[in-house]
């Protein structure tokens, strides 16, 4: 199999978007990293240890990520989940989410996946989970 399909990925890591918060993060601010992404604390956490998984290449839309980047992000989600659960035994669930486009709540035009630790009693009734982005549709 040729690696030519991955050449733009490697070349893209040298290109950063001026003014992009996620393109200028210093590696000493990383919680963890792999070849294609890094984990960072959320600046405005929903819960304690809320993390962001961010591709190193500047990509605005999640659906424009390569399969390699998606796989690397998934591996990082697992690594961070394990780290959080080992650090905090009160964590017994997670929400994972991506906002794609301003209309969906994307506030920074660089892909980032939220990993939000959940604890018993952190909300009165968690039924519906991420469906709560449309409050009238959360309960079913």
Regions found by a protein language model. Name each.
Residues 1-140:
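HIT superfamily nucleotide-processing domains
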């Amino acid at each position: 199999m040729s690696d030519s399909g991955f050449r733009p990925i490697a070349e893209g890591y040298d290109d950063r978007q001026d003014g992009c918060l996620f393109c200028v993060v210093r590696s000493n601010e990383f919680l963890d990293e792999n070849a294609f992404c890094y984990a960072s604390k959320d600046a405005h956490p929903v819960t304690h240890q809320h993390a962001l998984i961010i591709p190193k290449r500047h990509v605005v839309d999640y659906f424009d990520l390569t399969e390699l980047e998606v796989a690397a992000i998934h591996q990082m989600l697992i690594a961070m989940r394990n780290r959080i659960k080992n650090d905090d035994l009160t964590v017994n669930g997670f929400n994972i989410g991506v906002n794609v486009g301003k209309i969906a709540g994307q506030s920074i035009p660089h892909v980032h996946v939220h990993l939000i630790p959940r604890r018993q009693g952190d909300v009165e009734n968690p039924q519906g989970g991420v469906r709560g982005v449309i409050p009238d549709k959360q309960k079913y």
